[in-house]
Amino acid sequence: KPAGRKKFQETRHPIYRGVRLRKSGKWVCEVREPNKKSRIWLGTFK
């Protein structure tokens, strides 16, 4: 399943699954297990 092809053109940076930009300008990364609702937190990046 492609993750956000339209957003790629709008924001001009690659969109990775589980990676998003917060309002504060920091990138956050997390992974979700398909069978569970729990998330594995990978961290925050500038």
Curated annotation (Swiss-Prot):
One of its GO terms (molecular function) is DNA-binding transcription factor activity. GO terms for cellular component: nucleus. It comes from the Eukaryota. Its main location: nucleus. It holds the Pfam family AP2. Keywords: Activator, DNA-binding, Nucleus, Stress response, Transcription, Transcription regulation. Disulfide bonds: none annotated. InterPro entries: AP2/ERF_dom (IPR001471), AP2/ERF_dom_sf (IPR036955), DNA-bd_dom_sf (IPR016177), DRE1A-I (IPR045277). Coiled coil: none annotated. Residues 15-46 bind DNA. It is found in: Nucleus. The keyword Transit peptide does not apply. PANTHER family: DEHYDRATION-RESPONSIVE ELEMENT-BINDING PROTEIN 1A-RELATED, DEHYDRATION-RESPONSIVE ELEMENT-BINDING PROTEIN 1D. Belongs to the AP2/ERF transcription factor family. ERF subfamily. Transcriptional activator that binds specifically to the DNA sequence 5'-[AG]CCGAC-3'. This is Dehydration-responsive element-binding protein 1.
